[in-house]
Amino acid sequence: MANNSTGNAGNLMWYEKIIEGLTGPQIINDSKTPSGRVHIGSLRGVLIHDAIYRALLDRGTEVTYRYGIDDYDSLDGLPADGAPSLQEYMGYPLCNIPAPTGSKATDLADHYISEFLGIFKELEVGAQVYRMRDIYRSGRFNEAIDIILKKSDAVRKIYADVSHADRPGDWHPFQVICKNCGKIGATQVTAYDGKEVTYQCREDLVSWARGCGCNGKVSPFDGNGKLPWKLEWAAKWHTFGITIEGAGKDHCTKGGSRDVAAHCLRKIFGDAPPLNVPYEFFLVSGAKMSSSKGIGTAAREIANFLPPEILRFLMIRTPPRRTVNFSTDFDYIVKLFNEYDRLVENVPPDRAFDLQRKMLRTIEVNPASSACHPVGFQLLIALLQLPHIEVEYEIGKRTAGGLTQQDQENLKKRLSAATYWLDHHASEADRIELQASLPASATELSDSQRAFLHLLGERFPDGQLGEEEYQKFIFDITRLTPINQKNAFAAIYRVLLDKEHGPKGGALFAYLDRAFLVRRFSEINFSREAFWNESGITREECKDWFRKNKGQIACTNAKYLVNALIPAKESPDLHRYIRGKGVIEINVILSDKKVHRLRVMLSDFEGEEIDLKSEADYLEVYGNNFLKEIETIANIEIEITGKPIIYKDDQ
């Protein structure tokens, strides 16, 4: 998941780019048809518009954000969770259909939209909500309806020219609520005399609703029907004075619904269309969603999972024209939280217009919520699975000065999110268990990994340290082994959790018993010969390293090591060896005070009767000459510590 928080190059966020040339008061609009449980993708438009709204407020612009509930639309498909009894209401306005049994809602539309609007409050969305039933019934659209019906011929021409959709010569852009059966989706208007429309409730107009066959005349005003949604869109823009309204990319294609609505607005009302903000799809694991078909994850479920500021971050950080492909898998979710945490922790307090601060202002639901140090989500997932740990208490105990009230609130939200993820989304592969004994899979570790773990056990600090201190300790040991960090942490997770991944190593150490960790790491054995072969470097590689770091070296010392391999079941006193190696370990402290260890391969020997002391003496003479070369290259002095150390290992 790429970090797109800056949106565009320069000092402007994507939403600032959108409003850069706007002047005067602004009215933003968005809407939703509550035809089923609202999916998470519908929140993208809500929050894109809300980001623009907040940016305009910050700029001091007079701005209103309106959000419409298109509840006068007809039921044109059975909702995924709908009872079979809803079939009899196919074609009815959504707001005229009874709510499901047991629902506290007033009707079906209210049943579905109430859950969605509850999320608005949690996310601090600044929209003023209106319902189309109220707009039609109050007569607010009467003027627009009259104008549109009187220009039905112009509408038919726009449909034909823009979207290549032919309508019959008597077709009028209006849908009446049948006085006989109450359906709106099966009626067709064929005439308008300036006061009433003539309509027929047809049995065969659509495949999903069967009209009653009634013919009649009725006033089109005061809620007796509605405009087709492309004309309704234009009527909203005209009536409400909308200046900004984006839409999903499927509506913004040439000849698409947005194009038709914009042409109708210009031709019928003489108005310029609002500023468009086209936005790409919000996908879940690569799939597009649909509320009416029940495809995708419900917005309420994700809002139950993600803390509000994380959900806003998810929707707003990516510029509208880029797809968001959301997933609840482990890697995606941990990365999402980590990227938010980096944003919060790296905001400079003295740079009010910094890009990071602008993003934080746009995603926060409460300034205090982003003013504290967040606890890593991956760590919380791990701690919740460790036995005998009261997570909130243990975190508080390890926090300097204790947890503030805001810290506690944030931690509770994150613990709730981590628990929800474990209960609803974690796969078996994602779950961890602290291993009571060394797992069998530890045999798969390389000798460098095993030597690293053994050194961890040897040098494990006394007393209780903090997460960052333990993390520094781990990094120090990786440089002293030496081993690359990825392989080092993989080894830690393997012997503690029997996994290839895990939470931040230093954090894990901070919450586990020291004696347990020392015991586990110290029981790891390794082949010194194999370890040296894996971690050793050539003389030329060593020279190159010193050339590269010349001028940064603060202190250097070296020692000689000899390792001889004894045949299996042979006594070391017989002095019979298969083979051996001589190395020089150079410890270098750089100007950043970090210690690095270079293990330089200097000699190899083999034979039945080997005099190890002679080999050590040879190594020392040969090594001293090599160290003089290094001293000349780096313009330093190297201290040699003691005589060569001789190891005798079993085969």
Q: Model segments located where?
A:
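Catalytic adenosine-cofactor/nucleotide-binding cores of aminoacyl-tRNA synthetases and other
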Residues: 253, 258, 268, 280-423, ...
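Active-site cores that bind ATP or allylic diphosphates and position pyrophosphate for catalysis
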Residues: 125-129, 133-279, 283-299
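A structural motif corresponding to the C-terminal end of an alpha-helix
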Residues: 59-61, 115-128
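N-terminal catalytic cores of NTP/NDP-binding nucleotidyl/phosphoryl-transfer enzymes
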Residues: 2-83, 234-253
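A glycine-rich helix N-cap at a beta->alpha junction
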Residues: 88-105, 116-119, 123
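Charged, often glycine-rich, active-site loop that binds/positions anionic groups
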Residues: 73-89, 144-145, 288, 294, ...
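Basic, alpha-helical terminal appendages of large translation-related enzymes
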Residues: 1-23, 38, 65, 156, ...
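Glycine- and acidic
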Residues: 29-38, 130, 239-250, 283, ...
